[in-house]
Amino acid sequence: MTNIKIILGSTRDNRLGEKVFNFVVEEASKNPNINVEGIDLKDYDIPFFNLAMNPTYMDNPGYTGDTDKLSKKIDDADGFIFVMPEYNHGYTGVLKNMIDTFYNEWRLKPAAFVSYGGISGGIRAVEQLRLVLIELQMVPIRASVHIPLIFNQIDDNGLLKEEIKEAAHLDATVEDLEWWAKTLKEPRESKLK
C-alpha cells in the first residue's frame, strides 16, 4: 500500500486552510490504493531550524520530541500533498522551517499541491515551493489544485462549498501522485540503502 501524507502548511488561528485540509484528507482517503494520514503542523512544536550542520550532510541529526515524531512520519511516506495558503506571494514561514529541518526524509518522493488564497488561489506559493522541493531531490508533480478567493468558498455551515469540491478534480491529482509514488518507491529504496 502506498503511504501518502497530507501536510497542512498553516498554523494561524481561525485559518480557512483547515476546511481545505479536511476536504483533501477525506477525498484522498477514498482512493483504495493508498493509506492517507493528515499532518497538521499546528500539532507539532518544531523549533526554528537550528542544527549545527545542514541535515543534507547528516545521517542522524539527533532529533527529539515533536521533531523526531515528524521525521518518522515523513520518512514513512511515499508521497505528499501540501495544503497551503499564499502569504505575500509566497508560502508560509512555518512550512519553510519544517521543510528545511529535514532532508533525507524527503528525498526521491513525489509531491502534489492544493493551494488556496486570494485571486491567485495560491499559485505563486506553489511555484516557489516547487523550486525548494527540487533541491531536496523531490519530484513535484504537475497536477495540482488551486482554490481562489477562499474566503468566498465557505458555506453557511463553515464548510468548503460543494461546487468548489467538485470543480477541484482532486481525484485526478491524487491518482497522479499515487502513480508517481509507486513508480519511485522501488528505485528510491534501492538507491537509499
Residue ranges and their predicted role:
Residues 107-150, 164-168:
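Short, glycine-/small-residue-rich phosphate/pyrophosphate-handling segment
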Residues 1-6, 110, 148-157:
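A short small-residue
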Residues 92-108:
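Rossmann-fold NAD(P) dinucleotide-binding segment
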Residues 53-54, 103, 134-137, 182:
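A generic structural signal for secondary-structure junctions
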Residues 1-84, 89-97, 160-179, 184-193:
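N-terminal beta1-alpha1-beta2 submodule of the flavodoxin-like/Rossmannoid cofactor-binding fold
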Residues 37-50, 136-157:
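Mobile beta-alpha loop/short-helix "lid" or hinge segments that flank ligand
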Residues 119, 151-153, 188-193:
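Short alpha-helical linear motifs
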Residues 23-31, 101, 105, 132-135:
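Alpha-helical structural signal in soluble globular domains
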